[in-house]
């Protein structure tokens, strides 16, 4: 792979972008259930492209706004903006182009998606700006990902979501992502404390298991009550069980291992359960 392309993919955290796509497809599937239209391949591809563009825009602005902190944080000194592998001017260009393209693709789907597209972008931009407000930044990040469930629905149907289950799934995603951000931020607890960042790890003095468990219990409850039928319920119960078990391994396994073993499979399990329920 070309080294510049590899650097770009690393900069935008392409693996996290792929991780988000199943949440978009939850909204798409429920939107197709409402509209009863033939499988719109082009539209689905455009929605996936829009999700990727939104994530690129959000990741880029996050890196730009966090650059002063990243330069001082030993854990983030290897990041591409800090090392100069990606120039600040290049990052700004990536941000502008991805944001504009996202809005254009959203309008190409339907008017409502286009009009609501700035809200999706704004949710990504708020995350780095709220890190000094106690606790809230974890949930802002969660909302920015949870909202894409609704965005998938709007993109495919052109209307506001009416099924309460869709909002339940959106809340589940928001809380579940927030719980992982708490685990992730624990890596920077001492650094964040010196910089006045009031994350849950800082406020709890590193005792994050209880808050993470509480968030995961609530998120799992939303996941289970949002089930569309028996088959969907089985897979959601399995996902909820994995989510709760993951708390046990905090501090026992590296965060990357927790992500790969307990977080990465969840969206695919849930999506498979929904797909199976709707097909049978």
Report the location of each language-model feature.
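Multi-pass alpha-helical membrane architecture of UbiA-family
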Residues: 1-280
């Amino acid at each position: 792979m070309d080294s510049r392309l590899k650097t770009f993919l690393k900069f935008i955290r392409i693996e996290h972008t792929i991780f988000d796509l199943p949440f978009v497809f939850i909204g798409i599937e429920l939107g197709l259930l409402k509209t009863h239209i033939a499988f719109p391949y082009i539209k689905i591809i455009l929605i996936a492209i829009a999700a990727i563009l939104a994530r690129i825009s959000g990741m880029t602005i996050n890196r730009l706004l966090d650059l002063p902190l990243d330069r001082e944080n030993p854990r983030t000194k290897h990041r591409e903006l800090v090392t100069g592998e990606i120039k600040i001017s290049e990052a700004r260009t990536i941000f502008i182009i991805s944001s504009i393209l996202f809005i254009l693709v959203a309008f190409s789907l339907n008017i409502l998606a286009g009009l609501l597209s700035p809200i999706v972008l704004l949710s990504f931009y708020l995350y780095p700006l709220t890190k000094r407000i106690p606790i809230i930044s974890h949930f802002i990040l969660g909302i920015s990902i949870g909202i894409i469930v609704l965005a998938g629905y709007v993109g495919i149907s052109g209307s506001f979501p009416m099924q309460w289950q869709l909002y339940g799934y959106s809340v589940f995603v928001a809380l579940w992502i927030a719980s992982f951000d708490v685990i992730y931020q624990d890596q920077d607890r001492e650094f964040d404390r010196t910089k006045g960042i009031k994350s849950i790890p800082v406020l709890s003095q590193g005792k994050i298991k209880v808050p993470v468990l509480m968030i995961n219990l609530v998120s799992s409850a939303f996941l289970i009550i949002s089930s569309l039928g028996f088959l969907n319920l089985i897979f959601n119960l399995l996902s909820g069980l994995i989510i709760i078990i993951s708390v046990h391994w905090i501090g026992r396994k590296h965060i990357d291992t927790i992500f790969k073993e307990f977080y990465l499979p969840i969206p695919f399990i849930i999506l498979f359960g929904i797909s199976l329920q709707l097909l049978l």
